[in-house]
UniProtKB/Swiss-Prot annotation:
Protein name: Alanine--tRNA ligase
Function: Catalyzes the attachment of alanine to tRNA(Ala) in a two-step reaction: alanine is first activated by ATP to form Ala-AMP and then transferred to the acceptor end of tRNA(Ala). Also edits incorrectly charged Ser-tRNA(Ala) and Gly-tRNA(Ala) via its editing domain.
Gene giving rise to this polypeptide: alaS
Required co-factors: Zn(2+)
Gene3D superfamilies linked to this entry: 3.30.54.20, Bira Bifunctional Protein, Domain 2, Threonyl-trna Synthetase, Chain A, domain 2
Top enzyme category: ligase
GO molecular function: alanine-tRNA ligase activity; aminoacyl-tRNA deacylase activity; ATP binding; tRNA binding; zinc ion binding
GO terms under biological process: alanyl-tRNA aminoacylation
EC nos: 6.1.1.7
CDD domains in the cross-refs: AlaRS_core
GO CC terms, sorted: cytosol
Chief place of localization: cytoplasm
C-alpha cells in the first residue's frame, strides 16, 4: 500500500490514470454554483456537470475527469470530531453515455489495487451494492463484476436504498444505484453485525460509483434511461489519511501546518486534551473553508443571507473557539496564512486573493468580537435564572432577543446553552424570527420565490435573457462590466456585475430598451463548439475568473451577443416576453446586482 503518498501525488496519479483510459481532464469549477438556487455551494464533483448528466453534450467529450473544490454546510455542527470537514476536495471521473458498470468498476479496482497507483491489498477493501426494492432490482450485475475481479463474496454487502442509491437531484430526473468502496481501518468490529456503513469507524468509505440508469417520473415510477451515465467521487483528504495510516484527516498535511499555527498562537498542544482538540479542529476547518470561499473567483463576502451567512457563521464560530483556547484579540490571519501557503501551489487563486482574504477575515473578526462581548455578557446575566428552570429550556423569545438586539447567532446561543446543560426552544425562536422577517418585508420589494434549477421552459428563457442583459449592460455602462455571478429560477433572474456606482434611471431604461429590442427582433440562438482561443478571438464574453476547458460551447444570439456558456437556451428570442428590471442595488464593493423578470 502506498503509505507515503501525498495529496499532490494522489491528485496527479488519479488524473493521469483516467487520462490513460481516454478521459479528458476538465477544470474544477467555482465553489459558488451558477444558476442553481437549490444549493449555496458546490457540494460534489458532479454538481457542475448536472446539465451534461441530464443530456446536454459536453464540449470535452463523453469521458471526463477532474479535481473539484466542495463545501457541505450540513456538516458544520459535526465539525470538531476527527472526521468531519466543511471544505474538501473531490476526485471524479464521468462517463456521459459512454462506458457503464463493467468498465467503471474495473477502473476503480485497478486504481485502488495496482502497485503503480495506490496498491491497497484486496483484503483491506470492502464493497457495498444496492439490495433492490419495489422500484429497482437487486444490483447483482455490480456484485458479479466485483467477484470477477477477485473480490470474495464475504466482502460484498447488499445494502438498502438509503445507503446505495443516488438521486434524482429534484423531484424527477436521472438516478440509480451505486457501489461504494470502503477501507478497513483495522479497528475492532463493533459487534457481530459490523459492516461497511455501520458508522462505528472500522470501515471508511473512500470512493463511490453512481450508475445513472433510471429516470424517476412525476408519478413516482422509474423508467430505464436510454443514455446511461457514470458519476464517481473520491474524497482526497479522507483517502490520504487512510493510505498514510493516520487516525484522522487532521493528522495529514492538509492540516498539520494550520494546526501548528494555532498551537503557536494559543500555547495549546494538539493531542493533549479532547476538549481543546475539538476547538483546534473547528478553527482549522472553518478558517480553511473561509479562505477557499473568500478566495474563490466568485467571491462571497460575509452577510446575513445565503452563502454569505454560512461564511459569517464559520468565521464567528472559529473566533469563539479561539477565545475558548485563551486567544485574545484578532488571530485568524495566522491560520489563514498557513492555509494559503499550504494550498496556493495548486489553488493559485488563494495567493492572488490573499489581501482580500485577510482583510475580510479581520473585518468580520472585529465585528464579531464586539458582538461576542455584548452577547455573552447578556447570556451570563440570563444564565442563573435559566438554570433554575427544571426543564432546562431557554425560551425562544429570549434567544431571539440575543439575535435581534446583539446580533448574536442562534447557533452560538445553542452552543452556549449546550455547554450549560440547557436547550433552546428552536420552534419558538423560528416563529419569532419569521414574524421579524415578515415585518421587515412589509412595503419593500417584491419577494421573489425560489425554485428548482431545472431545464424548464421558463428557466431556460431566463438564462437566455441573462445573456441579453449582460451585453446590454456593456453597451450602456462600458466594457468594464463583467459578470460576477447569476442566479436563475423559473420566476426571475438575478445578475451580479462589476460597476463602481448605482445605475441611473436613464441607464436602467436604456438597458431595458436594448434587451426588449433584441427580444422583439426574434433573433435566432445558435450554438457552436470551438477551441477556447478561437472563442476569445471572435470576442465571445466569458465569466470573469472562471476556468474553462480547451474546447467550449459558444452561444450566439443573432449579431447581438456571443458568449461562452454551457446552455441551455431558447431557439429564438421572440418567445421570451417583455424584459423588466425590478431592482438594481449593491451586492458588494464594486459589484452591482439586478433582479429582473420576463412578463407575458
Amino acid at each position: 500500500m502506498n503509505k507515503n503518498i501525498t495529496i499532490d501525488e494522489l491528485r496527479s496519479k488519479y488524473i493521469d490514470f483516467f487520462k490513460s483510459k481516454g478521459h479528458v481532464e476538465i477544470s474544477g469549477r467555482s465553489l459558488i454554483p451558477e444558476n442553481d438556487p437549490t444549493v449555496l455551494f458546490t457540494t460534489a464533483g458532479m454538481h457542475p456537470l448536472v446539465p451534461y448528466l441530464m443530456g446536454e453534450p459536453h464540449p470535452a467529450g463523453t469521458r471526463l475527469t477532474d479535481v473539484q473544490k466542495c463545501v457541505r454546510t450540513g456538516d458544520i455542527d459535526d465539525v470538531g470530531d476527527a472526521s468531519h470537514l466543511t471544505f474538501f476536495e473531490m476526485l471524479g471521473n464521468w462517463s456521459l453515455g459512454d462506458y457503464f458498470k463493467k468498465e467503471s468498476i474495473a477502473y476503480s479496482f485497478e486504481f485502488l489495487t495496482d502497485e503503480k497507483y495506490l496498491g491497497i491489498p484486496i483484503d483491506k477493501l470492502s464493497f457495498t451494492v444496492f439490495e433492490g426494492n419495489e422500484d429497482a432490482p437487486r444490483d447483482e450485475e455490480s456484485a458479479s463484476i466485483w467477484e470477477s475481479l477477485g473480490v470474495s463474496k464475504d466482502r460484498i454487502f447488499f445494502l438498502p436504498k438509503e445507503d446505495n442509491w443516488w438521486g434524482p437531484a429534484g423531484e424527477t430526473g436521472p438516478c440509480g444505484p451505486d457501489t461504494e468502496i470502503f477501507i478497513d481501518t483495522g479497528k475492532p468490529a463493533c459487534g457481530s453485525n459490523c459492516r461497511p456503513g455501520c458508522n462505528c469507524g472500522k470501515y471508511v468509505e473512500i470512493w463511490n460509483n453512481v450508475f445513472m440508469q433510471y429516470h424517476k417520473n412525476m408519478d413516482g415510477s422509474y423508467s430505464p434511461l436510454k443514455r446511461k451515465c457514470v458519476d464517481t467521487g473520491m474524497g482526497v483528504e479522507r483517502t490520504v489519511a487512510m493510505l498514510q495510516g493516520k487516525p484522522s484527516v487532521y493528522n495529514t498535511e492538509a492540516f498539520t501546518s494550520i494546526i501548528k499555527s494555532i498551537e503557536d498562537i494559543s500555547g495549546v498542544k494538539y493531542g493533549d486534551n479532547e476538549k481543546t482538540d475539538t476547538s483546534i479542529r473547528i478553527i482549522a476547518d472553518h478558517v480553511r473553508t473561509a479562505c477557499f470561499i473568500l478566495g474563490d473567483p466568485k467571491t462571497t463576502l460575509p452577510s446575513n443571507i445565503g452563502a454569505g451567512y454560512v461564511l459569517r457563521r464559520l468565521i464567528r464560530r472559529a473566533v469563539r473557539h479561539g477565545k475558548k483556547l485563551g486567544i485574545d484579540g484578532n488571530f485568524l490571519s495566522v491560520p489563514a496564512s498557513a492555509v494559503i501557503a499550504q494550498n496556493a501551489g495548486f489553488y493559485t487563486e488563494l495567493k492572488e486573493n490573499e489581501t482580500l482574504i485577510l482583510t475580510e477575515l479581520k473585518a468580520e473578526e472585529d465585528k464579531f468580537l464586539e458582538t461576542l462581548k455584548k452577547g455573552e455578557a447578556e447570556f451570563e446575566k440570563m444564565l442563573p435564572n435559566l438554570l433554575k428552570n427544571p426543564k432546562k429550556i431557554i425560551p425562544g423569545r429570549m434567544a431571539f432577543k440575543l439575535y435581534d438586539t446583539y446580533g448574536f447567532p442562534i447557533e452560538l446561543t445553542e452552543e452556549l446553552a449546550s455547554e450549560s446543560g440547557l436547550t433552546v426552544n428552536r420552534e419558538e425562536f423560528d416563529e419569532a424570527f419569521k414574524k421579524h422577517q415578515e415585518l421587515s418585508r412589509a412595503g419593500s420589494e417584491q419577494v421573489f420565490k425560489g425554485g428548482l434549477a431545472d431545464h424548464s421552459e421558463q428557466t431556460t428563457a431566463y438564462h437566455t435573457a441573462t445573456h441579453l442583459l449582460h451585453k446590454a449592460l456593456r453597451m450602456v455602462l462600458g466594457d468594464h462590466v463583467q459578470q460576477k455571478g447569476s442566479n436563475i429560477t423559473a420566476e426571475r433572474l438575478r445578475f451580479d456585475f462589476s460597476h463602481p456606482e448605482p445605475m441611473t434611471e436613464a441607464e436602467k431604461k436604456e438597458v431595458e430598451r436594448l434587451v426588449n429590442e433584441a427580444i422583439k427582433a426574434d433573433l435566432p440562438v445558435t450554438m457552436e463548439v470551438m477551441p477556447l482561443e478561437e472563442a476569445k478571438k471572435i470576442g465571445a464574453m466569458a465569466l470573469f475568473g472562471e476556468k474553462y476547458e480547451d474546447v467550449v460551447k459558444v452561444y450566439k444570439i443573432g449579431d447581438f451577443s456571443t458568449e461562452v456558456c454551457g446552455g441551455p437556451h431558447v431557439e429564438r428570442t421572440g418567445s421570451l416576453g417583455r424584459f423588466c428590471i425590478k431592482k438594481e442595488q449593491s451586492s458588494s464593493s464594486g459589484v452591482r446586482r439586478i433582479r429582473a423578470v420576463l412578463e407575458h
